[in-house]
Amino acid sequence: MKSKIYKIISLYSFFPFQEKLIIDLKNKLLEIENENDLSGLLIFAREGINGTICAEKNVIDIVINLINKYADYRNLNIKVNFSKKKVFKKLKIKIKKEIVTMGVPEINPSENNGTYIDSTDWNKLIKNQNTIVIDTRNHYEVSIGTFQNSINPNTRNFSEFPKWVDDHLDNHLEDKESTNIAMFCTGGIRCEKATSLLKKKGYKNIYHLQGGILQYLDEISKEENLFEGECYVFDKRVALDQELEKGSYSICHACGMPVSIQDQKRKEYRKGIQCHFCIDQFSDDDRKRFEERQKQIDRLKVENHKIYKD
């Protein structure tokens, strides 16, 4: 029997999205989920759409066509990947104030943002001595892979980025008027919104990597690749390597940090219970709960394996 191949689509678009249409699209997508093997996470807001979906190709095509209609065929940024396994359990659709939370309501990325730089021109830009490169992702994402010589704002979440800009960005600029500011993220959405923030604050020469790290790795040859390490992703794969295959990292289910194969060999590591990042963060009662949860997970895996063999 031929095994299924799942198509994984990461997508986003900034556009004015009316509340009535948000509800309508959500209901139609849930109908598709009921009839098909569709999973993922989608976030809808008045500023647009963001998310990742996973299904077989024919189902993905139906969903993308539907979303394009509601987005009025505006520029829907899409990254494609494939997997032999589902990377989400089910479809979740969330309606929020923002499709990526920054907490600065006065900016409007659909009307005012920086200049897209494609993968081919990105290397030239970041090698320019008059360019600073900023990784707009969270610190735990940066810790497993980033571009050479990029600045890590050490944020725990994207809503901390505006404060970092206010407190630290000018320290990295020799000349606010002439220095190029190049920003990147996983798929393009956070760095695009970050450019809108910087333009609102009066910064010039603002650029962002079109399609983010994922598109860059897909388009740039191994010899020209300036990205070092693996790229964190928000699904069961945890991280992708340079070939966009599942990487070497797992997740610590206690604290959510990515842990490498080497990390899992450390004496502090206990699967599902703790790692060296969080050993001092939780109480003994917390660890007992985590241990019981891990036992339940392991039992379910054994039961599912038996069902599959039978």
Swiss-Prot record:
Keyword tRNA-binding applies: no
Main enzyme class: oxidoreductase
CDD domains per UniProt: RHOD_YceA
Top-level lineage group: Bacteria
Reactions this protein catalyses: uridine(34) in tRNA + AH2 + O2 = 5-hydroxyuridine(34) in tRNA + A + H2O
Residues of the Rhodanese domain: 127-225
GO MF annotation: an example: oxidoreductase activity, acting on paired donors, with incorporation or reduction of molecular oxygen
PANTHER family: RHODANESE-LIKE DOMAIN-CONTAINING PROTEIN 7-RELATED, THIOSULFATE SULFURTRANSFERASE/RHODANESE-LIKE DOMAIN-CONTAINING PROTEIN 2
Protein task: Catalyzes oxygen-dependent 5-hydroxyuridine (ho5U) modification at position 34 in tRNAs.
Full protein name: tRNA uridine(34) hydroxylase
Organism (species): Prochlorococcus marinus (strain MIT 9215)
